[in-house]
């Protein structure tokens, strides 16, 4: 929805005398001309929905069975700008975008499909390959070189080296004794691999692997009752979805992660209550935070994506009609 503000030129009269004195007449004439120009151009226009500069980025989410959706940012409607069709009728479980705008889409059953940029209107996968021997693709992340990291909801993380083809197989399988159930995955500016891990049903923690990802990772303390899912990084902050029905939140950590790291603060406004469960998170180039839900908060809210503006202390905007539990933002 757009807000339109129109400036209308007018001349104020007081006791039948113009308030523009002769000494200020040139300035008044200039101001009147400027205001008239604004009115002729329709005044100022701004989007009521937070987002990056128009035309610079897109939001990618899971869609109908066998599809992922692309939305232009800022979000101004519920109609996708493009549909990405998988080669099989499988539900989308993960999405990621590389630095050039190529999109990776993971699906239940263990397949990963790559859609080459630019994506407009509708797109078909250029290549599809398996996530190793796993039947799950929980989350995906690209590094700056275009290599793809895929979690398996188990004690392994598969790495696929660029360029990706239909014959791609894991070039590396990352594992360690303290990786139990890897779910979310993210890479910081130093290419440290951060994994959201669930060592037991009693809670979750974070593991940090330094390149080349063969050593024992840094492990944070387990957060009781937490169920960590998708993650996203903006500058020196790591955003981690803590998914619990009726009590979801986003835990925010300061980078770099150490063994002593704990959430610096949390975001729960708009994520708490009803049957809602948070799952997805992404950030745009303006550091606006997008949170994806499953379930709903009541009869008037069916779980539209939430958009938070830094410093993330206020109520979110709700992207009505745009739903997704796994998210990515990119070109």
Feature locations, PLM:
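Bacterial Sec-dependent N-terminal signal peptides
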Residues: 2-17, 23-25, 29-61, 65
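Flexible "stalk/tail and boundary" regions
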Residues: 46-331
């Amino acid at each position: 929805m757009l807000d339109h503000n129109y400036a209308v030129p007018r001349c104020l009269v007081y006791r039948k005398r113009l308030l523009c004195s002769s000494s200020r007449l040139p300035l008044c004439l200039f101001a009147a001309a400027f205001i008239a120009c604004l009115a002729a151009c329709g005044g100022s226009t701004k989007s009521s929905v937070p987002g990056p500069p128009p035309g610079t980025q897109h939001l990618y989410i899971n869609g109908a069975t066998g599809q992922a959706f692309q939305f232009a940012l800022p979000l101004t409607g519920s109609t996708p700008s493009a549909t990405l069709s998988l080669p099989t009728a499988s539900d989308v479980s993960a999405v990621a975008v590389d630095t050039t705008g190529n999109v990776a889409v993971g699906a239940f059953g263990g397949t990963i499909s790559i859609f080459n940029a630019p994506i407009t209107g509708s797109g078909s996968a250029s290549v599809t390959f398996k996530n190793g021997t796993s039947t799950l693709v929980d989350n995906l992340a690209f590094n700056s070189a275009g290599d793809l990291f895929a979690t398996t909801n188990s004690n392994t993380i598969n790495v696929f080296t660029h360029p990706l083809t239909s014959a791609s197989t894991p070039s590396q399988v990352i594992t360690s004794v303290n990786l139990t159930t890897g779910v979310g995955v993210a890479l910081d500016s130093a290419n440290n691999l951060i994994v959201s891990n669930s060592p037991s049903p009693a809670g979750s923690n974070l593991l940090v692997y330094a390149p080349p990802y063969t050593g024992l990772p840094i492990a944070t303390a387990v957060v009781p009752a937490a169920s960590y899912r998708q993650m996203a990084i903006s500058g020196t902050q790591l955003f981690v979805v803590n998914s619990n029905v009726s009590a979801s939140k986003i835990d925010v950590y300061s980078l770099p992660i150490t063994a002593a790291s704990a959430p610096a603060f949390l975001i729960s406004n708009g994520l708490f209550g009803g049957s809602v469960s948070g799952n997805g998170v992404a950030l745009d180039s303006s550091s606006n935070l997008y949170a994806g839900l499953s379930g709903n908060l009541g009869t008037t809210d069916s779980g539209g994506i939430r958009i938070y503006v830094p410093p993330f202390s206020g109520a979110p905007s709700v992207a009505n009609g745009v739903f997704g539990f796994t998210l990515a933002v990119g070109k």
